[in-house]
A protein has these predicted regions:
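Active-site neighborhoods and metal-handling regions in enzymes and metal-associated proteins
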Residues: 1-377
Length: 377
């Protein structure tokens, strides 16, 4: 545990501006952002002023007390005791500093995303009727959008490890290999290279299954002439990679070649356009121009990229929250390019995805990896 008090202080300044009494941390990415580590059940409270409170099982107490440097550590001794401790500490926080004396309920923020269990959000509202629960995005998005140098280094390392997994996957592409075998070997290679885990399943799609944007693992073996889409997402110290490549086992036919050429061209065009002030909608427009030029405009899907960092999809989460398509990019953001598959229904699809840092000169790739799609049969 290495508490980032500098980040906590910046969060508290935003909390005061937005009249937020506290942030309740119940998700892995915010916990790691503030506390420098992760736990199976990440729980913490950051008040508008003063030190954070860490909530943990009794056996973890010595380690956390040392890391907290005298700050509060709330210990629970039973599974049911955890929510009681959160509620007790939260009531202490919201009762202080005059926050409870206003006409409206004190506001408590929490991340509302995939990794925050819905049942805990519902339970929290039930046992805390004297507070208003709001999203922590208006606080966390400005803090986490622009990556610090150490964050960029970890993301680049995650991308490097994804490349090791992709190398291993490519080596295995031969007639009759199964997607399960390719996924297993790629995952093993990445874990041996230093990945903690992956942020999504390991996607390996063959043949017609390459039409799916997230097809998990194809049920049938690879055959000569098949397209193969592989998408790898290792994490290093919580930071996510996203590397996708499309291969052809043997010589591509005309339509396959057109798909591959088009996608490679649109990725480069979007990368060059990825500058501060530009939106994902603008980048989608650029991608559509390229697809239309190749006669594939009707197959283009919006959502060419999304934010990425400690969470696999961060703001702008253009593929999940439509208004995010219109958020201007900011220098220093990390964004993927190549998220949607360009697929011809009943035939197959292609995509090349990497992570870039937004700069005034266009997208700066964090770790380059070849897009050569040809694999000898």
């Amino acid at each position: 545990v290495s508490i980032r008090y500098d980040r906590i202080e910046r969060a508290q300044a935003l909390m005061r501006d937005q009249a937020i009494a506290a942030i309740v941390v119940m998700n892995h990415d915010d916990y790691r952002y503030f506390f420098g580590t992760d736990r199976t059940q990440p729980r913490g409270i950051i008040p508008q002023a003063g030190p954070p409170a860490l909530i943990a099982f009794a056996a973890e107490e010595p380690d956390l007390r040392e890391a907290a440097g005298g700050g509060p550590v709330v210990i629970f001794t039973s599974v049911g005791g955890q929510i009681h401790d959160v509620v007790t500490r939260l009531r202490e926080v919201t009762a202080g500093g005059g926050l409870a004396a206003t006409d409206s309920l004190p506001k408590v923020a929490m991340q509302m995303w995939f990794d925050t269990p819905a049942f805990l959000v519902d339970l929290f509202r039930t046992v805390n009727p004297t507070v208003e629960l709001v999203s922590s995005d208006p606080i966390m998005d400005p803090l986490r959008a622009i990556k610090e140098p150490d964050e960029l280094a970890l993301m680049a390392e995650a991308q490097r490890i994804a490349g090791i997994g992709m190398d291993r996957a490519r080596e295995l592409l031969r007639p009759d290999v199964t997607a399960h075998e390719v996924a297993t070997e790629a995952l093993y290679a990445m874990m041996r290279a230093g990945a903690e885990r992956t942020s999504t399943p390991t996607y390996v799609n063959f043949g017609i299954d390459t039409c799916m944007i997230h097809g998990r693992q194809s049920p049938r073996p690879l055959a000569r002439g098949d397209l193969a889409v592989i998408d790898l997402t290792p994490q290093v110290e919580g930071y996510c990679a996203n590397l996708a490549r499309t291969f052809v086992l043997g010589e591509p036919d005309e339509r396959q070649r057109e798909l591959l050429t088009t996608y490679a061209e649109l990725v480069e065009a979007v990368r060059e356009a990825m500058r501060p002030g530009v939106t994902i909608a603008d980048l989608d427009g650029r991608a559509k121009e390229i697809c239309a030029r190749h006669g594939l405009g009707r197959y283009q899907v919006n959502g060419i990229g999304h934010g990425i960092g400690l969470r696999f999809e961060e703001t702008p989460a253009s593929t999940i929250i439509p208004p995010h398509r219109n958020l201007p990019l900011v220098e220093g953001m990390t964004v993927t390019v190549g998220h949607p598959v360009l697929a011809i229904p009943g035939f197959g699809g292609a995509r090349f995805e990497d992570v870039y840092r937004v700069t005034s000169a266009g997208g700066e790739i964090l770790w380059p990896y070849s897009i050569d799609p040809l694999v000898e049969a």
